[in-house]
UniProtKB/Swiss-Prot annotation:
GO terms for molecular function: peptidase activity. One of its GO terms (biological process) is quorum sensing. Belongs to the AgrB family. This is Putative AgrB-like protein 2. The keyword Cell membrane applies.
């Protein structure tokens, strides 16, 4: 269905602007990706509001997705399965952060976990990113360097948000500091894991199991 809609939009735009087949394919791919992104965001938002985990689930989703744009990583063979997994994982992480275990966790421990994850994140990104796939090969060294640099910049922005959250917590007792920090921490950890061999094996296993169910 999504593929048909994106194809119709691409054909309409290409016809109006007299684009060749190459440009039409680019428009179709971009439209397809945009629709899937919107489906993910809207689905996570609705389910998050229903279960009162919207903040945590959405921050996790955006954290992992934005970093993924630059760092690459293991993908599901089916883009539809990939979208579904993203929604499910985001909701599960939202529930996890809202659980009594993390709700009762000492703030200093959250800070410590954050330090560990960011050290791990910088190491993994510096060593492995960007990770391409058969469907999305990175063909030039220049692009690889640009994507690695982008990944490190995104990580640094996340680190800045973490530090700012800590400052706000200690200065004004900001009540959302812990869930915001944990959501970013989980997002960074998950995305960086997909850059590793273990993450690749894990996603392939989940992908195989999901395809059997569908």
């Amino acid at each position: 269905m999504i593929e048909n809609i994106s194809k119709l939009i691409a054909e309409k735009v290409s016809s109006e602007l007299n684009y060749d087949n190459e440009r039409k394919e680019i428009i179709q791919y971009g439209t397809y990706a945009l629709i899937q992104t919107l489906i993910s965001i809207i689905s996570v938002l609705i389910l998050g509001l229903v279960f009162n985990i919207a903040l945590e689930a959405l921050i996790f989703l955006f954290t992992a997705s934005i970093l993924r744009k630059y760092s690459g990583g293991a993908h599901s063979e089916s883009s539809n399965v990939c979208t579904l997994l993203g929604i499910i994982i985001s909701i599960c992480i939202g529930f996890l952060i809202k659980s009594s275990f993390f709700a009762k966790m000492n703030f200093e421990l959250v800070v410590f976990i954050g330090i560990v994850i960011f050290v791990f994140g910088y190491f993994i990104v510096f060593k492995f990113a960007p990770v391409d796939t058969k469907n999305k090969p990175i063909k030039t060294e220049k692009k690889k360097k640009r994507m690695k640099k982008g990944s490190l910049k995104i990580l640094t922005i996340y680190l800045f948000i973490e530090v700012l959250s800590i400052i706000l917590y200690y200065n004004s007792g900001w009540s959302l500091a812990k869930p915001v920090m944990l959501s970013i921490i989980f997002g960074v950890a998950w995305q960086c894991m997909t850059l590793t061999y273990i993450g690749n094996i894990l996603l392939k296993t989940i992908d195989s199991f999901t395809n059997k169910l569908l």
